[in-house]
């Protein structure tokens, strides 16, 4: 786990020049426009909270896991199951290159996150959400953000 954190830090430093870290309210607007508010019963606050605890709203966040797979982007979507990293035999359920999940354009990441919620166990896929967001009052996550 410690190694994963160090590799994440290195990844952020290497890609820092191209990195975009969104603000909470900017993400609230993007997520709202993308139809995430109440998607499969999860409020906008759930999505904003989850993104914060998964990536700190950093579009280029990458975490190398012990099994050699990598979690990518603002939602930390895993390469083994959800995206294509290269020649490895990943499942690529989202039919997207992992590199598309670490750009400032969140379209592919949002589409993939919706697929994860719909096809797995809701937001339980994300440990950050389970630990910090699940079952809590999340109304403050969109407070003062000018979203409905």
From Swiss-Prot:
Residues 1-19 form the signal peptide. It catalyses: Hydrolysis of (1->4)-beta-linkages between N-acetylmuramic acid and N-acetyl-D-glucosamine residues in a peptidoglycan and between N-acetyl-D-glucosamine residues in chitodextrins. One of its GO terms (molecular function) is lysozyme activity. One of its GO terms (cellular component) is extracellular region. SUPFAM superfamilies: Lysozyme-like. It is an enzyme of class 3 (hydrolase). It holds the Pfam family Lys. Expressed in testis, epididymis and placenta. Disulfide bonds join 25-145, 49-133, 83-98, 94-112. Keywords: Disulfide bond, Glycoprotein, Glycosidase, Hydrolase, Secreted, Signal. It is found in: Secreted. The keyword Signal applies. PROSITE patterns: GLYCOSYL_HYDROL_F22_1, GLYCOSYL_HYDROL_F22_2. Transmembrane segments: none annotated. Glycans are attached at residue 58. Residues 20-148 form the C-type lysozyme domain. The keyword Oxidoreductase does not apply. The active site is at 54, 71. PANTHER family: LYSOZYME C (PTHR11407), LYSOZYME-LIKE PROTEIN 1-RELATED (PTHR11407:SF62). Monomer. This is Lysozyme-like protein 2. It comes from Homo sapiens (Human). The lineage of its organism: Eukaryota, Metazoa, Chordata, Craniata, Vertebrata. The gene is LYZL2.
